[in-house]
Amino acid sequence: MPKLAVVLLVLLILPLSYFDAAGGQAVQWDRRGNGLARYLQRGDRDVRECQVDTPGSSWGKCCMTRMCGTMCCSRSVCTCVYHWRRGHGCSCPG
C-alpha cells in the first residue's frame, strides 16, 4: 500500500476530536452525543470549576483556571486585562 494511502487511512481512523490550546481543553461534538459533557465526566474533573465559553452548545472550551476572552489563563490567580491594540490577555502575579 502506498505511503499516502496509509497516511490517509490513519487520519480517517484517528480523528482529532480533542486538542489542548493555551492551557485549556477544546472539545467538539461527536456522533455519540455532547463531547463537552463527556469530557467533564472523565476522571476527577469538577464541572463546577469549569468555565465554558459557549454555554448551551455541544462545542466549547473548558477552563479549569480563569477564562479571559476565548482563552484559559495559566493559573487561577491570574486576572484578565485589556492591552491596547493587542486585545485581552492574562496578567499573572510573580
Swiss-Prot record:
Presence of the UniProt keyword Signal in the record: yes
Gene Ontology cellular component terms for the protein in this record: extracellular region; host cell postsynaptic membrane
Keywords: Acetylcholine receptor inhibiting toxin, Disulfide bond, Ion channel impairing toxin, Neurotoxin, Postsynaptic neurotoxin, Secreted, Signal, Toxin
Removed propeptide positions: 25-45
Annotated disulfide bonds: 63-72, 68-80, 73-90, 78-92
Compartment(s) where it occurs, according to its Swiss-Prot or TrEMBL record: Secreted
Tissue expression: Expressed by the venom duct.
Predominant place of localization: secreted
Signal peptide interval: 1-24
GO molecular function: acetylcholine receptor inhibitor activity; ion channel regulator activity; toxin activity
Domain of life according to the entry: Eukaryota
Keyword Disulfide bond appears in the UniProt entry: yes
Subunit organization: Hetero-, homo- or pseudo-homodimer (identical sequence, different post-translational modifications).
Record function comment: Alpha-conotoxins act on postsynaptic membranes, they bind to the nicotinic acetylcholine receptors (nAChR) and thus inhibit them. Through its two C-terminal domains, this homodimeric protein would bind to two nAChR allosteric sites, located outside the nAChR C-loop of the principal binding face and at the adjacent binding interface in a clockwise direction. This toxin specifically blocks mammalian neuronal nAChR of the alpha-7/CHRNA7, alpha-3-beta-2/CHRNA3-CHRNB2 and alpha-4-beta-2/CHRNA4-CHRNB2 subtypes.
Family designation: Belongs to the conotoxin D superfamily.
Record remark: domains: The cysteine framework is XX (C-CC-C-CC-C-C-C-C).
Protein name: Alpha-conotoxin-like Cp20.2
Species: Conus capitaneus (Captain cone)
